């Protein structure tokens, strides 16, 4: 007689108590993800109302950087406070940041609200994934992970709609306030259905504060320099960020508490993987920060339409990931190399078509939309295979660290990329001279810069493919 584990279906995930638990977990990710697209959609309207174009990219950079810190706090928060209290703390922080954004009279207050939002949102995001193993049987884990991850696809539909409608009505603040009742319902559900205790021993592990502080400082260095249009100050910010990242690598190699698996700084083992992941991730998540603004100013689109057009890259990323999941192992090298090529082609197309502007007719927008889709789809095609290789190449004792590092690297490159995008846009004239001419010049330089980033992704992907054909070193 053979033992076998029954395959759990979607019906099992939504049966009885599992249904309300599932809704609670997806609620945390949905709130975080929808908020991302709401903010991106309404940001052009926000700066038109309260000013702060110089700090445009800071809204994303600070939000994502705070999300990294929030997600890093979750393991200790779960073990010491328990799931129920952890969710309550995360929801209260997120709500405080959301209300601050909705009441912000100026950009500095808005940025403070976005940082608070990011801290709470990062907690909710990490809690949702961490809770899966606690509240569900192992047979349900793949379904639960798929459901939670799918909320990003839902967010690409819901976020731009909420942000766009309120922006067009001239009440952008209500876009943030509209999240308040949802946060309240989510909190009540969490307090009702989640366990008080996590079932695991209290964690006494120290957080990797030196590395987290250096990551944050690197993003802030670039962001601070980007405020000025002076080349010297911007170059100084970039140089300081590079120095901080080199220091981070030194600290990480010697630290007893690491944030990356062993071998992460070896090109032959994990280094090329992380570089490719970082370059590709930044090319999508950072460039799309300015896309709604470009569509509104240069192509005569409403906030609602601009928000949806900006979400094309994210939606195509999801479709690409789904479509490539069944690709045979022998063909993944070609897929990994294809993604950066698609990125370069798409970015060059955007650099040519977006700056001149148009009246916004469908035939003007169609090639731009195709370019956006090509970029996102290419990253999506290669994403599952990059993650799979990271898990395979990481040492056995580093498997949990490898899983967590993917999210951290993606978030960090998004934050750093947004800061760099803000620097390039400001230097290219987004704020001075501003207007149509300044925005067009910023778009040209921004997409040209991200084309270079995609080209660098090809270089690292080529190194990755070549290293896969050679014996792997144990660590570095």
Which sequence ranges carry the predicted segments?
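Short, Lys/Arg-rich, polar N-terminal cytosolic tail immediately upstream
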Residues: 1-15
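N-terminal membrane topogenic signal
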Residues: 12-21, 206-208
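12-transmembrane solute porter fold
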Residues: 18-35, 39-41, 51-62, 66-75, ...
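Alpha-helical transmembrane segments
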Residues: 23-26, 92, 210-219, 341
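Membrane-embedded alpha-helical segments in integral membrane proteins
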Residues: 36, 40-44, 96-102, 153-168, ...
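Helix-loop-helix hairpins in multi-pass membrane proteins, especially solute transporters
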Residues: 73-206
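Short, charged juxtamembrane terminal tails flanking transmembrane helices
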Residues: 143, 469-476
């Amino acid at each position: 007689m053979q033992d076998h584990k029954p395959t759990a279906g979607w019906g099992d995930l939504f049966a009885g108590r599992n249904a309300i638990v599932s809704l609670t977990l997806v609620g945390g990710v949905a709130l975080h993800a929808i908020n991302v697209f709401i903010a991106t959609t309404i940001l052009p309207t926000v700066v038109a109302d309260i000013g702060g174009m110089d700090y445009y990219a800071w809204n994303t950079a600070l939000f994502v950087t705070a999300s990294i810190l929030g997600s890093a706090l979750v393991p200790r928060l779960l073990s010491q406070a328990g799931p129920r209290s952890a969710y309550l703390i995360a929801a209260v922080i997120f709500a405080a940041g959301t209300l601050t954004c909705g009441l912000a009279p100026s950009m500095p207050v808005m940025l403070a609200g976005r940082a608070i939002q990011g801290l709470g949102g990062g907690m909710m995001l990490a809690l949702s994934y961490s809770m899966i193993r606690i509240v569900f049987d192992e047979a349900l884990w793949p379904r639960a992970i798929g459901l939670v991850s799918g909320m990003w696809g839902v967010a690409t539909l819901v976020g731009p709609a909420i942000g766009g409608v309120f922006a067009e009505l001239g009440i952008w603040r209500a876009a943030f306030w509209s999240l308040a009742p949802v946060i309240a319902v989510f909190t009540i559900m969490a307090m009702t259905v989640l366990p008080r205790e996590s079932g695991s021993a209290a964690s006494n592990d120290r957080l990797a504060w030196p590395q987290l502080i250096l990551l944050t400082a690197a993003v802030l260095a670039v962001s601070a320099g980007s405020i000025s249009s002076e080349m010297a100050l911007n170059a100084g910010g970039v140089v300081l960020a590079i120095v901080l990242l080199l220091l981070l690598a030194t600290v990480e190699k010697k630290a007893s508490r690491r944030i990356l698996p062993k071998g992460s700084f070896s090109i032959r083992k994990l280094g090329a993987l992380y570089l490719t992941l970082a370059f590709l991730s930044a090319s999508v998540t950072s460039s799309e920060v300015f896309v709604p603004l470009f569509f509104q100013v240069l192509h005569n689109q409403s906030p609602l339409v601009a928000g949806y057009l900006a979400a094309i890259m994210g939606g195509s990323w999801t479709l690409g990931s789904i479509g490539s999941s069944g690709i045979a192992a022998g063909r993944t090298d070609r897929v990994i190399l294809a993604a950066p090529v698609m990125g370069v082609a798409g970015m060059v197309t955007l650099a040519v078509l977006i700056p001149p502007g148009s009246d916004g007719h469908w035939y003007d927008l169609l090639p731009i939309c195709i370019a956006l889709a090509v970029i996102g789809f290419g990253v999506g095609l290669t994403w599952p295979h990059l993650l799979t290789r990271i898990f395979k190449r990481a040492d056995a004792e580093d498997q949990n660290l490898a899983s967590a590092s993917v999210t951290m690297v993606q978030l960090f490159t998004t934050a750093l990329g947004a800061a760099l995008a803000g620097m390039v846009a400001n230097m290219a004239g987004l704020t001075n001279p501003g207007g149509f001419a300044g925005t067009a010049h910023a778009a040209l330089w921004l997409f040209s810069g991200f084309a270079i980033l995609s080209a660098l992704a090809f270089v690292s992907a080529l190194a990755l493919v070549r290293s896969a054909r050679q014996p792997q070193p144990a660590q570095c």
